[in-house]
Amino acid sequence: MRDMSEAPMTWKKGGCHCGAVRFEVLAPDEIEATECTCSICRKAGYLHLIVPAPRFRLLTGENQLTTYSFNTGTAKHHFCSVCGIKSFYVPRSKPDGYSVNVRCLDEGQVRVARIALFDGKHWEEAMTTRVLDV
């Protein structure tokens, strides 16, 4: 598999189900996504693309977002208050960046080349063995 960190990047658009929240993320056409096994990601079917803050732009819907935090309170889970979809959030692993739900990107924006599994159910132990590069 080729190194995706060197691939050219363009702005990809996405959003929530109702369209009230729209964003764009700077990413290559082919990505590696992460599936986390923690309770909130598993129940939501969330598929992560974690990027540094400068590679994320909220286009519309800031006033439609509601935020949920639990456990340490570090992660800020942002949900559309109209349709309930979490299309992005500030992850505990990268509080200076964003995790975009790949499933909320507009169709045809990216191709998922690989899905890496992250044992979020055992977050602390998993973080000692895995480095999340962005």
Feature locations, PLM:
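A short Gly-Trp-Pro
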Residues: M1-V134
